[in-house]
Amino acid sequence: MPAIGIDLGTTYSCVGVYQHGEVEIIANDQGNRTTPSYVAFTDSERLIGDPAKNQVAMNPRNTVFDAKRLIGRKYDDPKIAEDIKHWPFKVVSDGGKPKIGVEYKGESKRFAPEEISSMVLVKMKETAEAYLGESITDAVITVPAYFNDSQRQATKDAGHIAGLNVLRIINEPTAAALAYGLDKNLKGERNVLIFDLGGGTFDVSILTIDEGSLFEVRSTAGDTHLGGEDFDNRLVTHLAEEFKRKYKKDLRSNPRALRRLRTAAERAKRTLSSSTEATIEIDALFEGQDFYTKVSRARFEELCADLFRNTLQPVEKALNDAKMDKGQIHDIVLVGGSTRIPKVQSLLQEFFHGKNLNLSINPDEAVAYGAAVQAAILSGDQTGKIQDVLLVDVAPLSLGIETAGGVMTKLIERNCRIPCKQTKTFSTYSDNQPGVSIQVYEGERAMTKDNNALGTFDLSGIPPAPRGVPQIEVTFDLDANGILNVSAKEMSTGKAKNITIKNDKGRLSQAEIDRMVNEAEKYADEDEKQRQRITSRNALESYVFNVKQAVDQAPAGKLDEADKNSVLDKCNDTIRWLDSNTTAEKEEFDHKLEELTRHCSPIMTKMHQQGAGAGAGAGGPGANCGQQAGGFGGYSGPTVEEVD
């Protein structure tokens, strides 16, 4: 059973598999190699991917996207407050955690971001299963290199809820570097800068790639809240203000109008990557008012100027951390859809004094490609060019504990290789102190109050002693997923305690995860029921129209008028019933079909027999077959019926 690689993106996701020495990026059921990270809830069903994005203008309040911008964050995060202004769906606080409120099948539901992400992951898993023809459980999932511990852990939880065994969480730029290194058969030692600007996040990583097989990350930097969505927001704000200026109407109060404007803005943004001007035409955008306008590339660049410039700070930081200067970078590789923006490219090129940028890998698929390779390596595949691949990644943020006075004492420095383990000895702050509270933080600031709290645990039962005498050994163990385990041991008694950091404010408890796993199975069952319901409805519709067509087109003399009217009346009754019972259950459709078949079958059989009899008289036995085939009176579809 192969393992798959999934690029779980803010706006689009992508899945790949490594087999027969090659990576296949797998197209979904719509034939697209990337799938929108959208989940929609309606009165009757749940939609994921393309169908969800296609109906967003009709159902903006119950169509959820950008879950990656919520995952692993606290509700009071200022970034979330900023995003809520742009989202048509409702985000509420549930014990400090953000939850998404929607209406589903007439009921109000609340979903954690992990649940929404897990639904997208299920879609990617099903896409791979349909292609490979077998069930899949093992996967490697990518995250932005700058994701913190709680965001990584929450992504892993989403995989678990989706029924996946997450072999590894790997960093997106590292995965892209893997794709670049293997695809280009690099020779010698090369310093490669991966510039990854996607729909919602931005990463820069510098790697040294040796002979295309040793991938060593030297440094990483980024912004987990910068990407194409932010450029869209700027354009939408500009267009909404233009509409208000022209027509004295504020459409921002109307989610549907805003969504249609956003879709047009996104399309215009893409157009501006290849043209210098984009036209926006939206009929009856708001209160019957059409909106036609043009946006120039220069205007778009001006609207996003500060955001584009902000991409250069992490590049500088990554170079400093790697202790390299610009001239030591051999290749600058662009990844992520937003790197298609000409201004982003020209700023980066100027920063590197006119050096050519490498556009040779597919920016939408490179991350999933690398994830698929890593999945194959972790599941023991030793074939082809991946057999010698070794990947060495780094920690994106420093990790430490709070010591007296609120000082951040680092145990693991940022950009240290992972997995890694560090131990330091601490002592008590006051005489006869019976226990210590170990508070774990991540970040680069000197004081813990300015850093991100990951978790706390207490070590008690320390024997009475003067301050500074007890020896408490604290060990930080950062695993290959970038997830932290912390242990503390009092040396004289040997008392020890350890925790995997579970960010109490941002993380899901095991009980919540178990509940979500059960609910995910329930939703999958409901989706299956909905599919079966639609199949039954289609079977009934198709039978009604086929019978109606056959009777309508029956040659004169084959069917007497009474029988014909009887069939047509019954068919018309059924069509009326279908129109007024669109949400009927599968059993009702099946029952209607049975009833209709019982009524029409004898008449249809009689019609065929008459046709067959006439044929035998006219052209001997040989004509029977042909006559029978045409027995539906001009109906050209199949004339064989399955007998139950």
From Swiss-Prot:
**What UniProt keywords are attached to this protein's entry?**
ATP-binding, Nucleotide-binding, Stress response
Q: What are the start and end residues of every segment in region (Disordered)?
A: 610-644
SUPFAM superfamilies linked to this entry: Actin-like ATPase domain, Heat shock protein 70kD (HSP70), C-terminal subdomain, Heat shock protein 70kD (HSP70), peptide-binding domain
| A biological-process GO annotation | response to heat
Among the GO molecular function terms of this UniProt record, one is: ATP binding
Q: What induces it?
A: Heat shock induces the synthesis of seven proteins at five otherwise inactive sites in the polytene chromosomes of fruit fly larvae. Two separate sites, producing two and three copies, respectively, code for the 70 kDa protein.
Give start-end positions of Gly residues composition bias: 612-636
Superkingdom assignment: Eukaryota
Please give the Pfam families that the UniProt record associates with this protein.
HSP70 (PF00012)
Outcome after substituting E22K? In strain: DSR 3 and DSR 4
Q: What is the effect of changing N320T?
A: In strain: DSR 4
- Keyword Nucleotide-binding set for record: yes
Impact upon substituting G95C? In strain: DSR 4
Q: Which InterPro entries match?
A: ATPase_NBD (IPR043129), Heat_shock_70_CS (IPR018181), HSP70_C_sf (IPR029048), HSP70_peptide-bd_sf (IPR029047), Hsp_70_fam (IPR013126)
Impact reported for D306N = In strain: DSR 4
Q: Which family does it belong to?
A: Belongs to the heat shock protein 70 family.
Output the PANTHER family linked to this UniProt entry.
Answer: HEAT SHOCK PROTEIN 70KDA
Known NCBIfam families for this protein?
PRK00290.1
Any extra detail in the entry?
A: Most strains have three copies of the gene coding for this protein at chromosome locus 87C1; two tandemly repeated Hsp70 genes (Hsp70Bb and Hsp70Bc) and one in reverse orientation (Hsp70Ba). Some strains, including that sequenced in the Drosophila genome project have three tandemly repeated Hsp70 genes (Hsp70Bb, Hsp70Bbb and Hsp70Bc).
Protein name (Swiss-Prot/TrEMBL): Major heat shock 70 kDa protein Ab
Q: State the species of origin.
A: Drosophila simulans
